[in-house]
A protein has these predicted regions:
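Glycine-rich beta-alpha junction loops
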Residues: 18-25, 47-58, 114, 131-132
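Structural preference for beta-strand elements that scaffold enzyme active sites
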Residues: 11-16, 40-44, 125-127
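Short, hinge-like loop/turn segments at secondary-structure boundaries
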Residues: 3-8, 31-34, 60-64, 143-146
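Glycine-rich, positively charged active-site loop/lid region within alpha/beta enzyme cores that binds
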Residues: 33-99, 121, 168-172
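Short, well-structured alpha-helical segments that form the helix of a local strand-helix-strand
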Residues: 107-114, 151-161
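Glycine/proline-rich, positively charged
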Residues: 1-29
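Short helix-capping segments at alpha-helix termini
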Residues: 4-12, 38-39, 104, 147-150
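Conserved short secondary-structure transition element at the edge of the structured enzyme core
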Residues: 7, 48-49, 82-146
């Protein structure tokens, strides 16, 4: 901020950080400085599906396709990889998927919708990734869901999972 001011340039408008149901370090590290009361820098989150872990396709009850990233690439995003992730990470991902199912949403829709409702997110914007056109369409469909689709009851359930499985990516 100071450098931009010293150079007579506009200040940063957004910051890109990994942010998801499983990775919330922004909330404790940067949310206050980025808030509208301070520097008003919105978060533009990436890795909202944690490399696909929050898509539901790696649940114990699911059978991931051979072309799925974590199947095809053993070392891809190791902290989220089902073969390498901590048990608490997999437990949280499975519990979030169950919340989505009870609400009639896909796990990916829940993960994206949750990010969109966070106060720090820049204009509800979220960076999504996909391997297939079908995945891209599912991710885009999540942006058509009204924010009210995430009910207070669902938020309470999400918060309860978070309290039991607090930021599992921070303890690698």
């Amino acid at each position: 901020m100071r450098v931009a001011e010293q150079l007579g340039m506009p200040p940063p408008a957004t910051i890109q950080n990994a942010y998801s149901l499983l990775c919330r370090s922004f909330d404790s590290d940067l949310a206050e400085v980025c808030s509208p009361r301070n520097h008003n820098v919105g978060l533009l989150p990436w890795s909202v599906l944690c490399g696909g872990l929050l898509s539901g396709k790696y649940r114990p009850s699911a059978r991931a396709e051979a072309s799925a990233r974590f199947v095809a690439f053993e070392d891809y995003m190791r902290r989220w990889h089902p073969a390498h992730a901590r048990d608490v990470t997999l437990t949280a991902a499975d519990e979030y998927a169950a919340i989505a199912e009870r609400a009639g949403l896909s796990p990916a829709e829940l993960a994206i919708l949750w990010c969109r409702t966070r106060r720090s997110i820049a204009h509800g914007s979220v960076i999504v990734g996909a391997t297939t056109l079908a995945q891209l369409q599912q991710n885009l469909d999540a942006f058509t869901l009204p924010l009210e689709s995430l009910t207070d009851e669902m938020i309470e359930e999400i918060d309860a999972v978070h309290m039991r499985c607090r930021d599992p990516s921070n303890s690698l």
